[in-house]
């Protein structure tokens, strides 16, 4: 059986709000859509933190559990938990084999966490990962730049994912958006 991958996650801070969106498509290799309703964005730490994944589904669940454990260990300190996950992920021979990326956010901080040890906080409050990530990132940046007060973070996240779904064959229109205000 081929590698099963999930696709596009987008996150944004905008006008005091924040939102994360993900599509529902899970693809086997490059040929078969296995599921269209996967939930790749979740609430953690009593609903105060959002986390989303792109990559291998089983690997992502391992990372979700690890991140949630660190988040609890460090009493909700998002940056500390992300750094500790990245250190453990990069330093452990077995964990280094995991093929996934995480976006994590709370009301004030947005981070990308990868297995190569990166913990990246964007300058503009926008991140996107997965096969449609570049499309969602481009759409989201344009929307945020020109939306001003007319769009919420939730609306920007949903519109960015809709744009990615129109372009990327590995991203569908079954979009789940979670927001913190």
Curated annotation (Swiss-Prot):
GO terms for cellular component: HslUV protease complex; proteasome core complex. GO terms for biological process: proteolysis involved in protein catabolic process. Allosterically activated by HslU binding. Keywords: Allosteric enzyme, Cytoplasm, Hydrolase, Metal-binding, Protease, Sodium, Threonine protease. InterPro entries: ATP-dep_Prtase_HsIV_su, Ntn_hydrolases_N, Proteasome_sua/b, Proteasome_suB-type. Gene3D superfamilies: Glutamine Phosphoribosylpyrophosphate, subunit 1, domain 1. The active site is at residue 7. The keyword Cell inner membrane does not apply. The keyword Hydrolase applies. It is found in: Cytoplasm. Its main location: cytoplasm. One of its GO terms (molecular function) is metal ion binding. Na(+) binds at residues 165, 168, 171. Its EC number is 3.4.25.2. It catalyses: ATP-dependent cleavage of peptide bonds with broad specificity. Belongs to the peptidase T1B family. HslV subfamily. Protease subunit of a proteasome-like degradation complex believed to be a general protein degrading machinery. A double ring-shaped homohexamer of HslV is capped on each side by a ring-shaped HslU homohexamer. The assembly of the HslU/HslV complex is dependent on binding of ATP. NCBIfam families: ATP_dep_HslV (TIGR03692), PRK05456.1 (NF003964). This is ATP-dependent protease subunit HslV.
């Amino acid at each position: 059986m081929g590698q099963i991958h999930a696709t596009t996650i987008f996150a944004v801070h905008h006008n005091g709000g924040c939102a994360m969106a993900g599509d529902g498509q899970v693809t086997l290799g490059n040929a078969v859509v296995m599921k269209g309703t996967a939930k790749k964005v979740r609430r953690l730490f009593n609903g105060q933190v959002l986390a989303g994944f792109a990559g291998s589904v089983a690997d992502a669940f391992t990372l979700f559990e690890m991140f949630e454990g660190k988040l609890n260990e460090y009493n909700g300190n998002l940056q500390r938990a992300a750094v500790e996950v990245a250190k453990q992920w990069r330093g452990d021979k077995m964990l280094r084999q995991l093929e996934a990326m995480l976006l994590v956010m709370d009301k004030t901080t947005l981070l990308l966490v990868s297995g190569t040890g990166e913990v990246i906080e964007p300058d503009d409050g926008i991140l996107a990962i997965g096969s449609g990530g570049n499309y969602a990132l481009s759409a989201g940046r344009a929307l945020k730049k020109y939306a001003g007060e007319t769009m919420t973070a939730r609306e920007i996240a949903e519109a960015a994912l809709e744009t990615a779904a129109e372009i990327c064959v590995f991203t569908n229109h079954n979009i789940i958006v979670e927001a913190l205000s």
